Amino acid sequence: MAVNHYENFPVASLLLPARLRPAVRALYAFARGADDIADEGNAGNEERIAGLDYYAAQLDKIERGETPEPEQFRILQQVITQYRLPTTPLYQLLSAFKQDVVQKRYEHYDQLFDYCNRSANPVGQLILHLYDAATPENLRDSNAICSALQLINFWQDVALDWEKQRIYVPLDDMRQFGVTEQHINHQQYDAAWQALMAFELQRTRELMLSGSQLALRLPGRIGLELRSVIQGGLRILEKIELVQGNVFQHRPVLSKWDWVVIGWRIVRM
């Protein structure tokens, strides 16, 4: 289960109504393309920022009612017009991707949470708008779920992010538990690291559960899709706990048995 950036889009899910799949694919293409500019290949920071600025310029054209240049953006324009989607979430995604280019550490949890607000929450907001279900209550709970999914991805990918010289664990949390960057560099799995991970996992679980009622309010396929996402995220948290936070040697993935467990829990929600 991957829950980073654009992969929060349920692009291939059979639970999506056929009528919405083209729209979701267009949104996915935008997010995937922008994320790749920020994170893939060997381009320098200036080139990455320029690429993201180009995406923003195409959004600006859509905002002004002009026709953007590449076909990808013309398709996106049609989706935005058809479903009366706000463009603010798309700009927020670009802002987060730019931040990924230049920022590798987060001093406080609030800073990380703000990043999640722009890197993950726009996904849920756009999906709710597609379903014409973007009420204040639904948006609040969706934001909690999407931020939790993003945080889960950070905790399971500590070692992978270190390869890109990124640490998403808040530095003041690390200091509180006596953990340093050398713990990650040397994959040092000790009592301090275990305590830090236990703290982050519990906080993330509480955040996820705070938004879980959304899955029960939304009807039909979207509710079932969301219950699957929530239970999948919670299962990943459990698997990290089972190895006492040792994500260095045991990066958690969902097995067939895990999906059986998830299916049972979906029924019981």
Whereabouts are the PLM-identified features?
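Catalytic cores of Mg2+-dependent Asp-rich isoprenoid enzymes
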Residues: 1-150, 155, 159-269
